[in-house]
Amino acid sequence: MRRVAVIAGVIGFALGALAAASVFFAWPMPGHGGAVATPNHPSFSEVQWPYPTDEWGKGKAFRCEAADCGVEVNLYVRAKIGFCNCKTGVSDDAELDRLSDFRLMGEKLSVLGPGRQINVAWMKGRSRAYAISGPFQAQNSALAVAFNDRCDAIVATAIVAQDRPAAIEPSVIEFLNSKTVMHWAEVTLGL
């Protein structure tokens, strides 16, 4: 009788450990490469521009906390006056790559797929997702977005604290269409 109880206990323990392991390894974990649902009400707050001034000057920086966006998102937006292809705008991935602020994204980038067309207010452009890797770096990804008004481009870089930036793209594009960003863009572009 005692032997049956010990065997039943061992089997029960093994099944419990198996269930716990499957839950741990199967459920997505935000910030650890799991899928992140698009939040219903993302809330971006303006923060100080963290980068040194370069030929494009300072831009605007915003942060959406994990509680609001499902994962922490740092968004950097700035104008590149006269730098966009005046005839075609941001119409392909090559132009998006030329305009993007890759220096803000990290050391090593890998394209996660082809870019796609986006609209921000009256402007058209493209977005594209990248994986970021480097020594001593947490798993991050980035979303490069560029759109233009004639020869002037607005470039946005979203650094996402997980490996699937496409999940947060709708929230980033929605924020780029907000009054906050559009007012800044109109003033900066002299419209």
Annotated model-derived regions:
Residues G59-K60, G70, K87, F136-A144, ...:
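Short, surface-exposed coil-to-beta transition loops
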Residues I81-M123:
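Structured, soluble extracytoplasmic/luminal domains of envelope-associated proteins
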Residues I7-P28:
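Hydrophobic membrane-insertion alpha-helices, especially the h-region
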Residues Q48-E95:
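Secretory pathway targeting signatures of secreted, lumenal, and periplasmic proteins
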Residues A26-P42:
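Ser/Thr/Pro/Gly-rich low-complexity linker/stalk segments immediately outside membranes or between
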Residues E55-G57, C69, W122-K124, A146-A153:
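Short, solvent-exposed coil/turn segments at beta-strand boundaries
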Residues R150-L191:
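Surface-exposed amphipathic alpha-helical segments
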Residues G106-D149:
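Signature of long, low-cysteine stretches enriched in small and polar/charged residues
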